[in-house]
Amino acid sequence: MNIEDVVLKYALANAVKYGGRADVKAVMAKIMAEVPDLRPRAREVRQLVEAVVAKVNSMQPEEQLRLLRERWPEALEERRVEQRRPGIESLPELPNVRGGVVVRFAPNPDFVLHLGSARPAILNYAYRMRYGGRFILRFEDTDPRTKRPLVSDEVNAYEAIREDLRWLGVRWDEEHIQSRRMEIYYDHARMLLSMGAAYVDLCRPEEWRRLRNAGRACPHRGQSPEEALELWDRMLRGDFGEGEAVVRIKTDLSHPDPSVRDWVAFRVIDTSKTPHPLTGDRYVVWPTYNFAVSIDDHLMGVTHVLRAQEHSVNTVKQSYVFKHFGWEQPVTIHFGRLRIEGASLSKSKLKALRVRYDDVSLPTLAGLRSRGILPEAIWELILTVGIKPSDTTVALSNLFALNRKRVEPAANRYMFVTEPVKLVFESDRELVAKIPLHPSYRERGERVYKLGPGRVEVYVSSRDVRPGAVVRLMELANVEVLEVGGGAARGRLHSLELEAARRVGAPIVQWVADPVEVRVVKPVAVGKKVEEVGLGERALEAVEEGAYLQFFRYGFVKKVGRLDFVYVHD
């Protein structure tokens, strides 16, 4: 393969993967990694890459994909080996599977993904893994006014969604961005107008609603294709303002659901006031969700659509586009809404909280990742719920239980004391505490503390001591509390054996000697968290960042800084 072909191959592969736009740096990195012999010629190669990338980016995404399939089909198969996940085989069979399947996950990038968004992503990808085929990531971003894509200094929703999917272990075979496919939608609008299957409506919105609700035709419905195309061209030129002209698909004016009757396919959006973050004010006529989806599902070869029950009426609306063009509509399966008990998954409500999208108190995927929830736990939750048509409500505690069984074996145990007070007592002997890192994995080792003889000072929680009570200092000794006050407590050595503590009903409490100050961020509600400051073992300084631990009688935590932790769950 000559150098020109090498560059073209990787430029096409990069463009197909990322929505029709190849990146010079990414293509260069791939070439230098795959063909190291070219490194001495890096400057020459870069000039060629820049030229080829410009040429590739001028192509329509369909042309890029076609050329890549024709010349280098193996590039489409260069994917990491996918691990079969438990639970996939328990999903019901899909109807009308002919070989593999082509499925899609189509988020609106007006916000990041949350736990509810993970459901269609995982279910569609699970069937892609089960049957083989293609999984398409498609950004549906054709409403720059009411559902404006989120691109700001804080977050780029396009990239955040990609990052969330990678973290989930969802890998896409190709990517498309609808706002970069406008000419494709325009071409198909022109076809429908030429066929008499659509028309340009100039009625005032209130007049249209009156006619629609009465099941009567708009006076513009009978316009000739020539008249419709002339009005269409005027729309594209910007002759109409918002609400003055729309393109409608001809449906059934007697349909029992008024929203299905001649629904809007295109409308005018003044992008000089609400520019699109990717295309600016280049376009003023924008396709609606149902039109763009219909065209894309056909052109991308989608065979099966798995989506929420709330889209059932959209399936009906889209059927008219398929009928007008004589296309076969994908098999569509609707599943019920996933609700999280005590946690809203509404995008608008999550946005209104005014906290970072990756805050540990949010049920966004980024927030759950920051908190320490593992993607495998989310997979198990979603596959357990499955594709039931009825709504499902689960508690976050269900997700936490699935996560707990995964982090528990790895989480070494440490002592952490909140609201600490110093407990002082005398001992006539040396006290030795041997605390295993994990009670079920003794081979990991233990920490040994030697205190006394003489004055012994340890820190315990103020909630664990009251005058007259006996407490069991974990793995150390039993101490009778004599007095408490002024941020300190005084006691006397009662006994050493665990059995003696049991006889007097002494609670086992954690304690810290030679402490360090520890901070734990703890989510308490959606959008709310508290910081708890306490004392922990000095051994925590040596724990690697990112490690999961269990603080005795407190819960599982994840280390995120030198002595900073995030509370994961109990």
From Swiss-Prot:
It is an enzyme of class 6 (ligase). A motif ('HIGH' region) lies at residues 107-117. It catalyses: tRNA(Glu) + L-glutamate + ATP = L-glutamyl-tRNA(Glu) + AMP + diphosphate. GO terms for molecular function: ATP binding; glutamate-tRNA ligase activity. Transmembrane segments: none annotated. One of its GO terms (cellular component) is cytosol. Coiled coil: none annotated. One of its GO terms (biological process) is glutamyl-tRNA aminoacylation. It is found in: Cytoplasm. Keywords: Aminoacyl-tRNA synthetase, ATP-binding, Cytoplasm, Ligase, Nucleotide-binding, Protein biosynthesis. Pfam families: tRNA-synt_1c, tRNA-synt_1c_C. The keyword Oxidoreductase does not apply. Its EC number is 6.1.1.17. InterPro entries: Gln/Glu-tRNA_Ligase (IPR050132), Glu-tRNA-synth_arc/euk (IPR004526), Glu/Gln-tRNA-synth (IPR000924), Glu/Gln-tRNA-synth_Ib_cat-dom (IPR020058), Glu/Gln-tRNA-synth_Ib_codon-bd (IPR020059), Rbsml_bL25/Gln-tRNA_synth_N (IPR020056), Ribosomal_bL25/Gln-tRNA_synth (IPR011035), Rossmann-like_a/b/a_fold (IPR014729). Catalyzes the attachment of glutamate to tRNA(Glu) in a two-step reaction: glutamate is first activated by ATP to form Glu-AMP and then transferred to the acceptor end of tRNA(Glu). Belongs to the class-I aminoacyl-tRNA synthetase family. Glutamate--tRNA ligase type 2 subfamily. This is Glutamate--tRNA ligase.
